[in-house]
Amino acid sequence: MLGRHFLTLACAVAIAIAAPYTVTAATPPDQLVIAVNMSSMRGLDPHELNQFESAEVVANLYERLIVLPADKINEPQPGLAESWTISEDGKTFTFKIRSGVTFHSGNALTAKDVEWSLRRLVKHGLAPSTDLRQWGFSADNVDSLIRATDDQTLVLETPEVWNADLILLSLASFSTSILDSTFLADKAKNDDMGREFLQTADAGSGPYSLRSWRANELLIAEAYADYWQGEPAMRRVILRHLPESSAQRLQIEAGDMDVATRLSSTDLSALEAGGNVQIQKTPGFGFYYLALNQKDEILSNPKVREAFRYLIDYDGLSSTVMKYYGIKQQTIIPGGLAGASTENPYKLDIDKAKQLLTEAGYADGFSKIYFATPVTPEYEVAQSLQANAAKAGIKLDLQGGDHIGKFRERAFEIFSARSGERLPDPHAVLASYATNANNADDAKLTGLLAWRSAWDVPKEIQDMVLAAAHETDKAKRNDLYAKINKVYLESSPALITSFQRTDAKAVRNDVKGYTGHSTWLTRWDTVTKGD
């Protein structure tokens, strides 16, 4: 239970940052205050969450075996694993676990905690478990394949040979965060391995520990004094729920916030012109996408799917809503990765869409319910599509709200959002968008966007994706990805990509070392303040 002193402190912080916008006040020099939209933050269990804002929190509460520096995103570096070796057959990875690391509880971190954490991720079987399950790990085999041989040694064996980089990159994802197994043993309820407890608490070894979180209001994290890399300069990090872009803009202009996220392009432009903040645009490896449920008779028609590609105003959105948030891209491999293409053959063409709808037998159009994430810029993109679809005779009943659960359960007609892949490798996107080994409802492959969309991906595409993941020859792998890009584009996919994701944030000029991360692992312990 929190002490009386901390509760008083938390209340004081909450009151201070809720001050009227008209009062200009700099944030304390040893505190970082971030404005976020918490509406999609549902919990902080790293083996359960799959959400942008939550991931940044987890990146600082926990640590992982491997580190991917923001400026060297494709180069795995030592984290909790100070070194590793790979067997000649490419199937056995042996990690030497760093000594002298302690959890926030004071418990020493050992290979046993790593073993328990990675097994827990797989056994939970939730969406983030895809990061390990895709390599053949399952609840049935994980105990024999991932094991601690002593306090400082972890052995991980893969059932098959994969490109080694894929395994290492997976172990850098926030989903593979290492938890304090001894501490959580006392917090478990009904064999949940601490799942309920971790919704609002932490059991990590990261540079910050969680002190308070009130959903859709306030989150406070405090520097961990015994952090193995040294106590962070920012004594406290505060996340405040400010869903409105205009409110975020006013507060960062006034100096009441250090970092603002989820700002509209209009507000970002104004802040950039003001000179007191810098706009960070961090390239991501995900997309803004439109999902058409293939269990729906109308939407499963290839010509209908193709028609939707002509109802997106790629160029108009690029210069307005998406100016800071995305780069036009209609192919499936993100720019900057092997096999990426600059080909963008589609443009807004209402007449072409009408022609395709007529050929499909829907000359008079149809009506569908359209779920869209109610945040910037996703909702503005959805409104644009709704308006263009109406011109082609399609009535879209646009509904905001938190519909991600319905999407996971295939209980939707049309859904749009943005994805953010955690591995800087083409396979991360392709595994989700272009593989679906079992399209049955009871398969519950919820980590795959293709399964959620009930899309039975053409076998040719799935076979190539699998072959590329196994391929160890770089040139051959690149050739496969280039071919996949072409075939996917020509398949009238149920998952339509329109923009490669870019994450835009406004950061005040006196804040140094706050660096956006392409795989959602932005760190706070690198932050300092000063002119």
What are the language-model segments listed below?
Residues 56, 214, 218, 311-340, ...:
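Detector for C-terminal structural segments
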Residues 35-88, 119, 201-207:
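N-terminal lobe/hinge region of extracytoplasmic solute-binding protein
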Residues 70, 170-232, 236, 350-351, ...:
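Gly/Pro-rich hinge or "lid" segments in bacterial periplasmic/extracellular proteins
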Residues 196, 224-270, 395:
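Ligand-site clamp/hinge motif
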Residues 38-55, 77-80, 107, 131, ...:
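A structural "hinge/loop" feature
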Residues 82-130, 149, 155-157, 165, ...:
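Aromatic- and charge-enriched surface segment that lines or borders ligand/interaction sites
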Residues 21, 96, 133-186:
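Surface-exposed binding/hinge segments that line
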Residues 33, 110-117, 151-157, 161, ...:
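Alpha-helical secondary-structure segments
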